[in-house]
Amino acid sequence: IVGVGFAANVNGDGEVIALGRDAQTTLAEVPHHIELDRVLITGDAALGQRRGIALNAAHVTIANSDIRDIKDVGQDSQAIAGWNTPGPITIRNNFLEAAGENILFGGAHINIPNVIPSDIIVEDNYLTKDPLWRGTSWTVKNLCELKNARRVLVRRNIMEYNWSGAQAGF
């Protein structure tokens, strides 16, 4: 998918793009070899958006894209989150703005036996939170969080504008 823009869902529920499903139970069900390049995902300025991309696929590259205004009240929100994926995943040269975790791997039940999100590269990205969100009701958490992942390389990223909110961490 190249050069496509996506707006928030009605009421900001769910994810704008779902690559795979959290209900898939075998590797044969996992979609694979997907590339998102120069994609724009924008949450609703007033209502927010729970998640930009649910990444439950294999051999995925997200590059040169802009995911912004991802935020929610009372629950986590993520620009990119993956949990039911074997990998590999490359997240490169993106603008990622979310109130919750900008990037999250793990944190939800994995339905494929013996699968751990693996072989993940996160490089040359700009992870941020809008400073205007400080002191509001948006649920603020970490810029990058790995709850369940292995063989992860994080390099040459800029991570800024994080403060203690629903979680004290970076």
Positions of PLM-derived features:
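Beta-rich catalytic cores
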Residues: 13, 49, 76, 99, ...
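Right-handed parallel beta-helix
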Residues: 2-8, 28-43, 58-71, 86-105, ...
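Leucine-rich repeat
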Residues: 76-77, 105-108
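Short catalytic-loop micro-motif centered on adjacent basic/acidic residues
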Residues: 81, 143-145
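Aromatic-rich beta-strand patches that line glycan-recognition/binding surfaces
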Residues: 15-20, 53-54, 79-81, 169-170
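Alpha-solenoid helical-repeat scaffolds
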Residues: 43, 47, 51-54, 69-71, ...
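Long, hydrophobic, well-ordered secondary-structure blocks that form the structural core
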Residues: 25, 52-55, 60-61, 79-82
